[in-house]
């Protein structure tokens, strides 16, 4: 028989940098999960990924206080900022431009994010990523 699920916790945790400090500690502590055990398992699972990369993580907590977790690909904005070389998007998207990004770069990002996107093909995924780039105040150019 499968374990009874008590709940899900969604967090964005930096790869290889899980610590029992907020926001991880309080979120897991409320559910009675062993915080240090999660930190050890998460850091071991993400040691191959560049340290500090934000990873959306879904933690499934069971009735016996055990847990499992699934990490997803980093947010599209993380990839976009890295590709363009900026720290943040435009404060006023649509008015002030934060830079430019090539459509080929968007396609690469879409390829990396494909499994987490609600898209059937690479063209649809590229359009989703393009929307994120435009929302950050970037101008999309051909190339």
Swiss-Prot record:
GO cellular component, one term: cytosolic large ribosomal subunit
SMART domains linked: RL11
Signal peptide location: none
InterPro entries: Ribosomal_uL11 (IPR000911), Ribosomal_uL11_bac-typ (IPR006519), Ribosomal_uL11_C (IPR020783), Ribosomal_uL11_C_sf (IPR036769), Ribosomal_uL11_N (IPR020784), Ribosomal_uL11_N_sf (IPR036796)
Name of a matching Pfam family: Ribosomal_L11
A GO MF label: large ribosomal subunit rRNA binding
PTM field: One or more lysine residues are methylated.
Domain of life: Bacteria
Gene3D superfamilies xrefs: Ribosomal protein L11, C-terminal domain (1.10.10.250), Ribosomal protein L11/L12, N-terminal domain (3.30.1550.10)
Keywords: Methylation, Ribonucleoprotein, Ribosomal protein, RNA-binding, rRNA-binding
Family stated for the protein in its record: Belongs to the universal ribosomal protein uL11 family.
Physiological role: Forms part of the ribosomal stalk which helps the ribosome interact with GTP-bound translation factors.
Protein's UniProt name: Large ribosomal subunit protein uL11
Source organism of this protein record: Novosphingobium aromaticivorans (strain ATCC 700278 / DSM 12444 / CCUG 56034 / CIP 105152 / NBRC 16084 / F199)
